[in-house]
Swiss-Prot record:
Protein name: Putative protein TfaS
Family to which the UniProt record says this protein belongs: Belongs to the tfa family.
Domain of life (superkingdom): Bacteria
Phylogenetic placement of the source organism: Bacteria, Pseudomonadati, Pseudomonadota, Gammaproteobacteria, Enterobacterales
Pfam families: Caudo_TAP
Length: 114
């Protein structure tokens, strides 16, 4: 239970349960008020951005899986497939290079259309 100090009309200090709820899941009681632990908040945001990065890369890789299969089988790619492969690889490079330390304000590149 979080306690809040309250001064009575006679000047006595008494402790009572705090009535103000935290604003974020990262708020901690400092004895007088809720204070946001911005380091913890930022750390969680960066972890989420890293997970988002991997999800974007996985989606991009899935979009070229048939092209990869053709290459592994030694088949020649058509010009459109080569172009698509290069475009998606450039996108993956851009996603990989994206700075996640600015989370939650990360600007991700757009996945190229097929």
């Amino acid at each position: 239970m979080i306690l809040d100090r309250h001064i009575t009309s006679r000047g006595y200090v008494c402790m009572r349960p705090a009535t103000i709820a935290p604003l974020t899941p990262y708020d901690k009681w400092d004895g007088e008020k809720w204070v946001t632990d911005t380091e913890a908040q930022h750390s969680v945001a960066v972890d989420a951005a890293e997970a988002q990065r991997q999800s974007l890369i996985d989606t991009a890789m899935a979009s070229i899986s048939l092209i990869q299969l053709k290459l592994q089988a030694g088949r020649k790619l058509m010009q459109a497939e080569t172009s698509r492969l290069n475009t998606v690889l450039d996108y993956i490079d851009a996603v990989t290079a994206t700075d996640t330390s600015t989370a939650p304000d990360v600007i991700w590149p757009e996945l190229p259309e097929e």
